Every structure is written in structure tokens, then in C-alpha cells.
């Protein structure tokens, strides 16, 4: 399952910082429904940084409410969201294989941004950070794109690719945060955790 692999990768990034964590997922107890598509919908004229920060804030709001409904003890809650942008065009998760092929075709041969917002709440204190990286894709043939999409790897990933997977073969250059491109920028996350008193 692609979503489980993503959660595992992000969990491994937190463990890299020495942070022990538990997942606070929707519907684990059947006590709520959340419309992820509605949360991740792009608003008219929304710039990529504003979009990813807004979505991360909404995810954090939902997680804080979820913890309260379940009567869980107060602890820091961390959320992140990643989007890919070419100019002002936002590339979220592809709807299907054909959509993934279109996205990759547009990104091929260009430099794009990967924006990951992180938000942390502990009690009434809420802190946020934004990581912006730049990734250059090589030119890709339609056959290369189709073969990559056929692996299933692009589905469920912003911009229809995972840098930690086979797409690394298409990336001659990047600048910024490798962990941020994966979905959780470790430097920014550590800064937020330190700001609320966690020694990382």
C-alpha cells in the first residue's frame, strides 16, 4: 500500500532525529470522517506557498480535534504537507495513471519547486515552517514516463514522483532539503521541536 510506505518513510525521518512518535490517523476508531480531497482542493488564484501552508494548517486542526475527541493526553502534534509547483501551477497527487503521465510530461526537462510546510502544536502554541527546494528533471520520452507510471510509484505522491524511488534516475540536480522533498524537512522540523522544548 503506497500510503503505508509513505507513512513509514516519514516515520523513519522522525526517528532519524531521535523523535519517538505515534500516528494519529483519521477513522482509526471509526469516530470521524474527513474529506482529504476537500482539504487539499486548490483555491482560485492560490499561490503554491499559501496553498501548502493552508492545507498543513487544516490537517493540524483536524489532528488536534481528533486527539480531543479520543481523549488522548496532551502531546505535540506534527503535520506536514508537500506540493510541487512549476511557476504558479500546483501539482498535487495525480488522480490516476493518465493524470500522472500528464504531470510528468509537463515537469520533464524543467526545474520546479517542491514546497513542504510543517506545523507543530503543543497546547495553545502553534508553530509553522516552510521548506522550498528546487528540483531539475531531465527530458523524458513518453515511453520513459509510461514505464515509470506503470510501476505505480507516482500514485499518491505530489507531482507524481518520489525522489527516494525510481524517479531519482530523472533528477540531475536539486537544491534545498532532500528530506523536505521526501515530505518532512528535518532541519525545519527540528527547529520547531526545539522551540517547544524538545532536545533534538
Tell where the protein language model's regions lie, with residue ranges.
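Alpha-helix boundary/capping motif
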Residues: 1-5
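GST superfamily/GST-like fold recognition
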Residues: 7-10, 100, 110, 132-200
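N-terminal polybasic phosphate/anion-binding patch
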Residues: 7-76, 89, 143, 150, ...
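Active-site-adjacent loop/tail segments of enzyme domains
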Residues: 51, 82-112, 139
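Residue-level signal for inorganic ion chemistry
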Residues: 56, 81, 100, 118, ...
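Ordered, amphipathic secondary-structure segments that act as subunit-interaction surfaces
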Residues: 76-82
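Short beta-strand and adjoining strand-loop segment in the mid-core
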Residues: 88-92, 119, 130-138
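Anionic-ligand binding region
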Residues: 103-104, 117-121, 125, 132
Amino acid at each position: 500500500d503506497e500510503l503505508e510506505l509513505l507513512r513509514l518513510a516519514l516515520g523513519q525521518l522522525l526517528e532519524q532525529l531521535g523523535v519517538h512518535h505515534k500516528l494519529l490517523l483519521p477513522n482509526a476508531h471509526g469516530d470521524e470522517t474527513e474529506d482529504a480531497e476537500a482539504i487539499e482542493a486548490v483555491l482560485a488564484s492560490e499561490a503554491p506557498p499559501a496553498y501548502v501552508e493552508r492545507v498543513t494548517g487544516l490537517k493540524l486542526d483536524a489532528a488536534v480535534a481528533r486527539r480531543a475527541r479520543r481523549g488522548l493526553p496532551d502531546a505535540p502534534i506534527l503535520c506536514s504537507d508537500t506540493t510541487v509547483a512549476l511557476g504558479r501551477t500546483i501539482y498535487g497527487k495525480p488522480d490516476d495513471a493518465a493524470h500522472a503521465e500528464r504531470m510528468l510530461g509537463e515537469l520533464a526537462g524543467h526545474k520546479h519547486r517542491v514546497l513542504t510546510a510543517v506545523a507543530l502544536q503543543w497546547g495553545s502554541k502553534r508553530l509553522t515552517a516552510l521548506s522550498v527546494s528546487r528540483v531539475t528533471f531531465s527530458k523524458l520520452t513518453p515511453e520513459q514516463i509510461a514505464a515509470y507510471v506503470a510501476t505505480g510509484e507516482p500514485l499518491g505522491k505530489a507531482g507524481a514522483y518520489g525522489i527516494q524511488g525510481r524517479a531519482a534516475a530523472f533528477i540531475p540536480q536539486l537544491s534545498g532539503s532532500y528530506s523536505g522533498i521526501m515530505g518532512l524537512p528535518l532541519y525545519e522540523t527540528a527547529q520547531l521541536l526545539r522551540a517547544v522544548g524538545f532536545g533534538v
